[in-house]
Swiss-Prot record:
This is Transcriptional repressor NrdR. The gene is nrdR. HAMAP family: NrdR. GO terms for biological process: negative regulation of DNA-templated transcription. It comes from Geobacillus kaustophilus (strain HTA426). Keywords: ATP-binding, DNA-binding, Metal-binding, Nucleotide-binding, Repressor, Transcription, Transcription regulation, Zinc, Zinc-finger. Its cofactor is Zn(2+). Belongs to the NrdR family. Binds 1 zinc ion. GO terms for molecular function: ATP binding; DNA binding; zinc ion binding. Negatively regulates transcription of bacterial ribonucleotide reductase nrd genes and operons by binding to NrdR-boxes. A zinc finger (unnamed) spans 3-34. Residues 49-139 form the ATP-cone domain.
C-alpha cells in the first residue's frame, strides 16, 4: 500500500477491525518513511449493481454518490456523519439483498427520502426539493403537508 502523502510503498498496519457487520475491514496504517497515518478499507468485491436513470441511461451504483447527497441535505444540521454512513450502508445492503442486477434511480431516491424523514425533517425537505424537482411553491407546500401528516401518525 502506497502512502497517500509521500507515495512510499512501505506502510505498516497499526490496527485492524471488522466494520459494516463484518462485511469489510478497517485498517489504520502508518508510512514507514514519513510516519503519516491513514485509514484503508478492505471490502468484498460484489457484482456490479447498475442504476437506471430517469432518462434511461445506465451507470454503476455509487455508495459515495448517495453519501454526498445525504451530506449536502444535512449541511449545517445536527446529523453525525456516522449516521449518514450507516444510512448509505443500509441502502446498499437492501439493494444488494434484492438480488437484482439493475435498480431504478427513483427507487434509490425514495429509499433515501424515507430514511431522511426519520432523521431530520429539514434535510428531508432539502433532499426532496432537489430529487422531486419542485417546479413551484405549491408543490413544495404539498410535500410539507405530507411530511406533517406522517409526523402526526
Amino acid at each position: 500500500m502506497r502512502c497517500p502523502s509521500c507515495h512510499h510503498s512501505g506502510t505498516r498496519v497499526l490496527e485492524s477491525r471488522p466494520v459494516e457487520e463484518g462485511r469489510s475491514i478497517r485498517r489504520r496504517r502508518e508510512c514507514e518513511q514519513c510516519h503519516y497515518r491513514f485509514t484503508t478499507f478492505e471490502r468484498i468485491e460484489e457484482p456490479p449493481l447498475i442504476v437506471v436513470k430517469k432518462e434511461g441511461t445506465r451507470e454503476e451504483f455509487s455508495r459515495e454518490k448517495i453519501l454526498r447527497g445525504l451530506i449536502k441535505a444535512c449541511e449545517k444540521r445536527p446529523v453525525a456523519l456516522e449516521e449518514l454512513e450507516k444510512v448509505t450502508q443500509e441502502i446498499e445492503r437492501e439493494l444488494r439483498n434484492q438480488g437484482v442486477s439493475e435498480v431504478k434511480s427513483e427507487t434509490i431516491g425514495e429509499m433515501v427520502m424515507e430514511r431522511l424523514s426519520h432523521i431530520d425533517e429539514v434535510a428531508y425537505v432539502r433532499f426532496a426539493s432537489v430529487y422531486r424537482q419542485f417546479k413551484d411553491i405549491n408543490v413544495f407546500i404539498e410535500e410539507l403537508k405530507e411530511l406533517i401528516k406522517k409526523g402526526q401518525r
